[in-house]
Structures are given as C-alpha cells and as structure tokens.
Amino acid sequence: TLYGSLAATGKGHMTDVAIIDTLQPIAPVEIVWQPKVFLPFHPNGMTFAALDSNDKVQENWTVYSIGGGALAENNDNPTIESPDVYDMENMTEILQWCEDTGKSYWEYVKECEEEDIWDYLAEVWATMKDAIHRGLEAEGVLPGPLNLRRKASTYYIRATGYKQSLQSRGLVFSYALAVSEENASGGKIVTAPTCGSCGVMPAVLYHLQKSRDFSDMRILRALATAGLFGNIVKFNASISGAEVGCQGEVGVACAMASAAANQLFGGSPAQIEYAAEMGLEHHLGMTCDPVCGLVQIPCIE
C-alpha cells in the first residue's frame, strides 16, 4: 500500500513498476493506492504486507522513502543504509578542517571513504554521460497523459547554431533536459541528489569537460565534493521534495553543481562553500506540486 505523496506521484515516478518488477518473480503483487492517507513519519510512506493462501496477513513492514534512494522505518529506527562514514556533520566543521589542513573537500572525502570510492564515482560519471547521450538521441512523447514531447534534441540542435555568447547556456539546458527526459521515461540515471533533480549535475559537468577539457580525474574529484555538499543537506535537513519541496531537490542539485564547478575553476574551500550556498538560496521556497504526479511539469516543462 502506497500512502500520501508516494501514492499521489507513484504512477509518474513508476514506483509501482519498480515494486512489481522486484517482487513479482517471488509472488503475485497487488498495489493499493492511498494518496489521501498520510502516515505520521514522512509523506512518502508504504506498507508491504505478506499474505498466505487464505489472504491472511503473516508479516507487514512499513517503510518510508526519504529521498535519494534512502529508506527509514520510523523515529526509533533511522535511515536504513550503510553506517555514516563522515566524522563531521556540518559545513562549518568541514570548512574549518580544510583551512586547518590546507586540503580541499574532495580530500576530506578521500580520507573518510574507502579507496573504491573512485571506481564508484567513475561509474556514476559514465552513467551520467550515457543518460545525456541517450536523451539527446531520443524523440517522441514522454509516458503519461500529458503527451509532453521530448525536446532535448531540438534544443541541442538549436544551441549548436547560437553565437558563442549564448551557446553555452543552450547546450547546458539541452543536456539537463536530456537527462530529465530519460528519468521521466524510466531510463537509467543518477540521483543527484534525487531523480527529480537528476539533470543539473550531469549537464554542468558534461559541458565544463567538453568546453574546458577537464580530465576525468578532476571531474571525479568535483563529484566527490558535490556529493559531500548534498550529504550535508540530507543529514541536517532533507532532499525529499515531498517533505521540503523542490528547494530540497533542484535547489540542492544547484548547490552541488555550483560547488563542483567552483572547485574545477580553482576556488578555495570558502569560495566553494559560498557558491553552493548561493546556488541553494536562490531556490528557497520552491514547492513540489507536479501536474498529474508526473516528473514532467514543472520538473521539465
């Protein structure tokens, strides 16, 4: 049973498809939609009930989707994921660490994470680029009743004909559209920090690499820094649009992209932090109220 915002937007986010694809090989699955019923802990609540042959409930599990792929059960059992790997919980402490050590944010990530973080980030970067490439090639209508047409390829072609002063903006826009349209179609993307805001980071980093010839290693370090900033918001506030509005999704994505871009251009830790702050504050107050529960309007349109 899907409750609240998870039920209201579940069709558009293909939540039911993900659940059925996962559980159907094990046993028959029935989805019950309860968009007007909100569970107490979080707007994105769901209950899994296992029934026997007599339709009697044998086990049930209530869990909440709190953003970026993370799950939580209730106030007594916080986020269900791997243990925290970062000793510091806010940007003030991390910025002070950078100033004391003379190191940057990505080096803090390197010290806290395992060595395979770079292999993981390489996979993330490859997935982001693949989503852009697929989105720029795809045409047609996005799934759902709105009949919204894909526009990334059209905007990309237009941007290539712009004068240099306008071309960068047009290209970044087309890249972001490409990834967002892939997400709306159920394609493979990276939560950055969420599915609804998945186009911002890839668009900015892809354009910077193509236009400025940044190496893959520099991009991976920028991703590490961006992830750190996103994690700070996730830990201290929320990246769930259902809980805090779009400011927690696109706003945080903009902050992450701003931090990454500033680092690529040689910004100091203080400048990187300030860039992220400005990126977030310009999105404060944005709500999450998608038409028909689809990640299309205003998420794309």
Give, region by region, the residue ranges found by the protein language model.
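Alpha-helical support elements that line or immediately flank enzyme active sites
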Residues: 1, 202-213, 259-266
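C-terminal regulatory domains involved in ligand/effector binding and gene-expression control
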Residues: 20-22, 28-162, 170-171
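Hydrophobic alpha-helical bundle architecture
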Residues: 233-301
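Non-transmembrane, aqueous-exposed alpha-helical and coiled segments at domain scale
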Residues: 2, 12, 42-44, 50, ...
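N-terminal loops that bind phosphate or other acidic moieties
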Residues: 18, 35-37, 54, 192, ...
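Accessory "access/gating" subregions that flank catalytic or transport cores
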Residues: 129-245
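Acidic, glycine-rich active-site loops and adjacent beta-strand->loop/helix elements
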Residues: 2-7, 19, 35-37, 223-232, ...
